[in-house]
Amino acid sequence: MRILMVSWEYPPVVIGGLGRHVHHLSTALAAAGHDVVVLSRCPSGTDPSTHPSSDEVTEGVRVIAAAQDPHEFTFGNDMMAWTLAMGHAMIRAGLRLKKLGTDRSWRPDVVHAHDWLVAHPAIALAQFYDVPMVSTIHATEAGRHSGWVSGALSRQVHAVESWLVRESDSLITCSASMNDEITELFGPGLAEITVIRNGIDAARWPFAARRPRTGPAELLYVGRLEYEKGVHDAIAALPRLRRTHPGTTLTIAGEGTQQDWLIDQARKHRVLRATRFVGHLDHTELLALLHRADAAVLPSHYEPFGLVALEAAAAGTPLVTSNIGGLGEAVINGQTGVSCAPRDVAGLAAAVRSVLDDPAAAQRRARAARQRLTSDFDWQTVATATAQVYLAAKRGERQPQPRLPIVEHALPDR
């Protein structure tokens, strides 16, 4: 099949797990013989005169990175304007698709959108080429904000999500919990939803057994620095852990809008010197940290899947996670990791303590987690299942959509 993948993240532009997901899915589909074109973007803030649109084949995938138009929008301050400008640049690039190295046009059999930020280009291109549109919903605005859609920007994002979901001919989620979430938020009358878990290339994350600890315990968080990730709970748990395990440290790897606030939280809990913010790490640096850490701590309040949990499991790092959403499906409590309820600082501290107090049991769980990856989270399996969704998707007749009322507490059970 000829697949047009539309994503606001694709290497080297990677913000979080979405970019890694699209990369691995695209390369796995290409390896299976499909003709894959990824439509993405140049890095934010780049000048089109020095960073023009590019069209290259990497790992068997044709990647078109649309240049950023010369505007003054920033993602942090002008998110919706920035997103619309990005979408406009993507549409222009998508309308000019030619078969690589020729003047012949290239026409997709399906358009695959990844999240609301590419709703406008994906919907426009699927309509232009008159082909089915499949959308993977990686997260929702209501989910990220504990069930609430409050404020102008959140309402705008939620409305675009609703539009994307209702324009889709087929939908994919990476966990059963996300299936339930988008059905509750946007149903009834949606296209068929298929749950396809994330995968992992375990060979890139070699397993390393923990060596007997000779010094203070080292904990590791990896991910975006956003409120819904619950990093502040790990910081709040650190003083409790240092009372029973003196010298315990927490390394925080990642970037995000809440870094300054998290530093304030570490100062508030008097663990700033025991907390290390290392920013974004390359693969080699991250792997070294995973191999050294006594536990990977992922205390999310909201997590549609949790790709970092798979990466830590592959590397052999004992897992301590919340049992929310996709994390509750990716980690089997007591078998492949230790889980606790989200927002439960005392429970999180107790879960980490159980890992530190019984390293042999932690190693048994780590080995079981690695073994499970090979059977349940293989990218070729993910690609095969995704291709089946493409084949089954049929472009439906479009009708004008009414503006739906937005319920402020959209997920009342959160």
Curated annotation (Swiss-Prot):
Keywords: Carbohydrate metabolism, Glycogen biosynthesis, Glycogen metabolism, Glycosyltransferase, Transferase. Its EC number is 2.4.1.11. GO terms for molecular function: alpha-1,4-glucan glucosyltransferase (UDP-glucose donor) activity; glycosyltransferase activity. Pathway: Glycan biosynthesis; glycogen biosynthesis. The keyword Transmembrane helix does not apply. This is Glycogen synthase. Signal peptide: none annotated. One of its GO terms (biological process) is lipopolysaccharide biosynthetic process. It catalyses: [(1->4)-alpha-D-glucosyl](n) + UDP-alpha-D-glucose = [(1->4)-alpha-D-glucosyl](n+1) + UDP + H(+). It holds the Pfam family Glyco_transf_4. Belongs to the glycosyltransferase group 1 family. Glucosyltransferase that uses UDP-glucose as the sugar donor to elongate alpha-(1->4)-glucans. Is involved in the biosynthesis of both 6-O-methylglucosyl lipopolysaccharides (MGLP) and glycogen. May also use ADP-glucose as substrate. CDD domains: GT4_PimA-like. Disruption phenotype: Inactivation of Rv3032 affects the production of both glycogen (two-fold reduction) and 6-O-methylglucosyl lipopolysaccharides (MGLP), but not that of capsular alpha-D-glucan. Cells lacking this gene are not affected in their multiplication or persistence in the BALB/c mouse infection model. They also show a slightly slower growth than that of wild-type at 37 degrees Celsius and a completely abolished growth at 39 degrees Celsius. Moreover, in contrast to wild-type, they are exceptionally sensitive to the TreS inhibitor validamycin A; the sensitivity is abolished by overexpression of TreS. Attempts to disrupt both the Rv3032 gene and glgA in order to create a mutant simultaneously deficient in both alpha-1,4-glucosyltransferases turned out to be unsuccessful. Thus, M.tuberculosis H37Rv requires a functional copy of at least one of these two genes for growth. Moreover, it is not possible to inactivate Rv3032 in a mutant lacking treS, suggesting the joint essentiality of the different alpha-(1->4)-glucans biosynthesis pathways involving these two genes. It comes from Mycobacterium tuberculosis (strain ATCC 25618 / H37Rv).
